Amino acid sequence: MTNIRKSHPLTKIINSSFIDLPTPSSISSWWNFGSLLGICLAVQILTGLFLAMHYTADTSTAFNSVTHICRDVNYGWILRYMHANGASMFFICLYLHVGRGLYYGSYTYTETWNVGIMLLFAVMATAFMGYVLPWGQMSFWGATVITNLLSAIPYIGTNLVEWIWGGFSVDKATLTRFFAFHFILPFIISAMVMVHLLFLHETGSNNPTGIPSNMDMIPFHPYHTIKDILGLLLMLTALLVLVMFSPDLLGDPDNYIPANPLNTPPHIKPEWYFLFAYAILRSIPNKLGGVLALVLSILILAIIPLLHTSKQRSMMFRPISQCLFWLLVADMLTLTWIGGQPVEHPYIIIGQLASIMYFSIILIFMPLASLAENHLLKW
């Protein structure tokens, strides 16, 4: 009699995806972030579901309903802060996951990579709409500023913005629809994750060397499940420390002021995980140009497989590309810092230089460095 794990239609899907999955023996802890992202998504859906039971998507009561959750609902405060800081953890894991893909050449699995980019856009949209829901000052003005960017689209821009708002400004209709989208998108993301894994399991995992490892595979369970559990414990520890000791560390104090359309905050800025893109947006004086740069700052990931000029897949043995990669990381951190600063000298010029560097490294320097490294191989 065959093992039910391998014969039952449901369990054999789980078995081939998480138990008997052949996995390269050499993959490092950088490969933990996929499973951590899955855990983050599960935590966000669970905490979000319980928050939605007590939240009201109405401009007159939204702010008070969040206060009610924190004060009156049993363990409501932990739900709220797990959800808010869970989003930060989600993005930390996302950026590390994408960075791993860039460094080790995982983008050569183009289907997996492209589904991943769509997932990144979906998660960013979900997080943006979630930030609007508490209806604080930064929620309202963030929603106003970011949705208003669509008015830069020629001809249809103004109509498009008013259609999204459901009126002539961000108001009750906007909040209601943002709540609806914020609720449904994580389930769409879950379906996209399955497609992401489907494409990944067609090719198998990459490994740090970038060399095919078909002759050196081990089962996912128990070897990598144990490794993933360690990563999970470390992430949950970090999240719980953040939630218990300084839950507002990554938030904006302005969001504790109820939304007031008549009073603009001195510095409108999104959550920290969007600041790098916001800095790129602000560094271009033209509105349409800024919006294009904002979209391209993420969409540029889609053309990275086309820019791969190296004979080697991974950067493991490519020191020039490694230097450029870490320069790109430093540049993104600089952009994140600039995005949170006021629009004044010297921040404007630093932001513009960092934005030029961001696109130059990806589009020009990295492909050229790869070609140079190809020549060095011949020596």
Curated annotation (Swiss-Prot):
Q: Where is the signal peptide?
A: none
| TM annotation in the entry | 33-53, 77-98, 113-133, 178-198, 226-246, 288-308, 320-340, 347-367
Q: Which cofactor does it need?
A: heme b
* UniProt membrane topology term: Multi-pass membrane protein
What's the main place this protein lives?
mitochondrion
- Positions that bind heme b b562: H83, H182
Q: Where in the cell is it found?
A: Mitochondrion inner membrane
Q: Which domain of life is it from?
A: Eukaryota
BP-aspect Gene Ontology terms:
mitochondrial electron transport, ubiquinol to cytochrome c
Give the cofactor note: Binds 2 heme b groups non-covalently.
For this protein, what is any one GO molecular function term?
A: ubiquinol-cytochrome-c reductase activity
UniProt keyword list: Electron transport, Heme, Iron, Membrane, Metal-binding, Mitochondrion, Mitochondrion inner membrane, Respiratory chain, Transmembrane, Transmembrane helix, Transport, Ubiquinone
Residues that hold a ubiquinone according to the record: H201
Q: Per its UniProt record, what SUPFAM superfamilies does this chain match?
A: a domain/subunit of cytochrome bc1 complex (Ubiquinol-cytochrome c reductase), Transmembrane di-heme cytochromes
- A Pfam family matched in the record: Cytochrom_B_C
* Cellular component, GO annotation: mitochondrial inner membrane; respiratory chain complex III
What residues bind heme b b566, as annotated?
A: H97, H196
Q: What else is known?
A: Heme 1 (or BL or b562) is low-potential and absorbs at about 562 nm, and heme 2 (or BH or b566) is high-potential and absorbs at about 566 nm.
Extract the PANTHER family matched here. CYTOCHROME B (PTHR19271:SF16)
The record describes its quaternary structure and partners as: The cytochrome bc1 complex contains 11 subunits: 3 respiratory subunits (MT-CYB, CYC1 and UQCRFS1), 2 core proteins (UQCRC1 and UQCRC2) and 6 low-molecular weight proteins (UQCRH/QCR6, UQCRB/QCR7, UQCRQ/QCR8, UQCR10/QCR9, UQCR11/QCR10 and a cleavage product of UQCRFS1). This cytochrome bc1 complex then forms a dimer.
Task: Name the protein family.
Answer: Belongs to the cytochrome b family.
**Briefly, what is this protein's role?**
Component of the ubiquinol-cytochrome c reductase complex (complex III or cytochrome b-c1 complex) that is part of the mitochondrial respiratory chain. The b-c1 complex mediates electron transfer from ubiquinol to cytochrome c. Contributes to the generation of a proton gradient across the mitochondrial membrane that is then used for ATP synthesis.
Protein name as annotated: Cytochrome b
- Origin species, per record, is Natalus jamaicensis (Jamaican funnel-eared bat)
